[in-house]
Amino acid sequence: MVVGFNHNVMYKGAVYHVQTEDSGISNPLITTLLYSEGTILASKKTSYADIIKVDQLEKVVEELMKEQHKEMLRNLKNGEFDDRIAQLAS
């Protein structure tokens, strides 16, 4: 199991939290969540069951996690969640 990533990021004057974690070989899933004040705004789950037997699995999973984490940060900064953020604000 790979240690997860957590980042707080400012966007349009508010702080958002992005968390990415690995569920481990028994449940080979990478989960990334975007939070605003404890509320989940978005999530992405990726299975890596198809690569369990790959050499250096931990390193490969860590790279997949980093990319998925960065993708969530980019999507936030690119405004993909603005409608959802506006819904929660009203």
Language-model features and meaning:
Residues 1-14:
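Negatively charged, low-complexity tracts enriched in Asp/Glu with abundant Ser/Thr
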Residues 6-8, 27, 75-78:
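Detector for Asparagine
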Residues 19-42, 55, 59:
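Short, surface-exposed, low-complexity cationic segments
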Residues 7, 44-46:
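Generic detection of short hydrophobic beta-strand segments and adjacent strand-loop junctions
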Residues 15, 22, 47:
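A broadly conserved detector of short glycine/acidic/proline-rich loop/turn motifs that flank catalytic sites
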Residues 46-90:
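Acidic, low-complexity intrinsically disordered segments
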